[in-house]
Amino acid sequence: MSQSSASSIFTVSRLNQTVRELLEREMGQIWLTAEISNFSQPASGHWYFTLKDDRAQVRCAMFRNSNRRTTFRPQNGQQVLVRASITLYEPRGDYQLIAESMQPAGDGLLQQQFEQLKQQLAAEGLFDQSHKQPLPSPAKQVGVITSASGAALHDVLHVLQRRDPSLPVIIYPTSVQGVDAPLQIVRAIQLANLRAECDVLIVGRGGGSLEDLWSFNDERVARAIFNSHIPIVSAVGHETDVTIADFVADLRAPTPSAAAELVSRNQIELVRQIQGQQQRMEMAMDYYLAQRTQQFTRLEHRLQQQHPHLRLARQQTLLLKLQRRLEESAQTQIRLLSKRTERLQQRLQQVQPQGQIHRYNQRVQQQEYRLRQAVERQLNGYRQRFGIACSQLEAVSPLATLARGYSVTQTPAGALLKTTKQVQAGDKLTTRLQDGWVESEITQVTVAKKSRQKKVVTQ
């Protein structure tokens, strides 16, 4: 036996492994239509059965994680469409199928057509996100393409009326089921684009079987949706129903009611937002007024600090301080001179030169006299300046005016009485005199003819 022949010798296990790998690699997944027989379901939950036709049969298994997605329970003798992978059970050398999904034969053929069209349109780019148009926000007018007598239209109108009653709606009635339905749906989409009345379209219908929804898996409908210049929201069936129209549309809604919510504004939410904006504006206004009130208070305080009465009082206080300082300074100088004189006298007494003492005494007396004269002149000057300042202060004092025989009269509101227009007969007045106040009542108001002023008569 040659070396090359020896390398081609297989063991049984190696043969079965090689065949299994070849089948799985070359065949992959396939669609198979057949009749079920020998169906069984052990405690593990897996399904085991035979798929056959009138000439052959093959073993098949469907594991629990796959069969739980099946919407029906298979029966012996039932025609089904199965998507499965081909493999080989190595211990026995039996080749078999591992089913991934299963449908009744009628729906299964439709599903196969669905998958084929889906792959074709996806390859052409009809599902690409780059082609999706954004929905208007907010929509000004909504178009609805569906059956005029279906529950879907009722649901859409009910939601729009609840959320946004003022939103205009245009209905493009069409069949949604049957042989003629796809062409009618296409024409309705084209008509809506031709009229350009709406800025968003809802295309859909209520729930049903795969066959009932088949109009929305039609290639013509898919291309009409793709070519629409108006954004389209698909709303076909229930949330679990998926059609070709859902993939092509600019946005998919799980139900017609959900589509109506997507294209409409929630007026309750808008009112809530407006109320929030109003509350924020009120808070901002309150803050602004509080800031302006504080500013006004500060300005009022500054104005009060500049009042003439306060300024006069401060000047008078300053004058009094200066007077005290002047007097204290003079007294201090006198005390210092007196102490110096005493020291000199003590020194003179110790020396006792009588003549010199007499002369020094005279000089001291003269100096003391001149000093007193100088201090007196300086004090007189300060007194004169102080008297002038007091006279000036007295001249502008309201009390000095009262002392000269004048009076100040106030209205009941507390304002100074300047003209007869401020009062009328029966009003009570308060008059400020030099030594007190007088309360009076007006009995008559007379206007002077020459000066055109009213005369106030009091009692």
From Swiss-Prot:
Q: Which family does it belong to?
A: Belongs to the XseA family.
Task: State its location(s).
Answer: Cytoplasm
Q: Name one Pfam family in it.
A: Exonuc_VII_L
* CDD domains, per the entry: ExoVII_LU_OBF
**Top-level EC class:** hydrolase
Keyword Transmembrane included in the entry's annotation: no
* Protein name as it appears in the record: Exodeoxyribonuclease 7 large subunit
Entry keyword set: Cytoplasm, Exonuclease, Hydrolase, Nuclease
Name the gene that codes for it: xseA
Query: Which organism is the protein's source?
Result: Yersinia pseudotuberculosis serotype O:3 (strain YPIII)
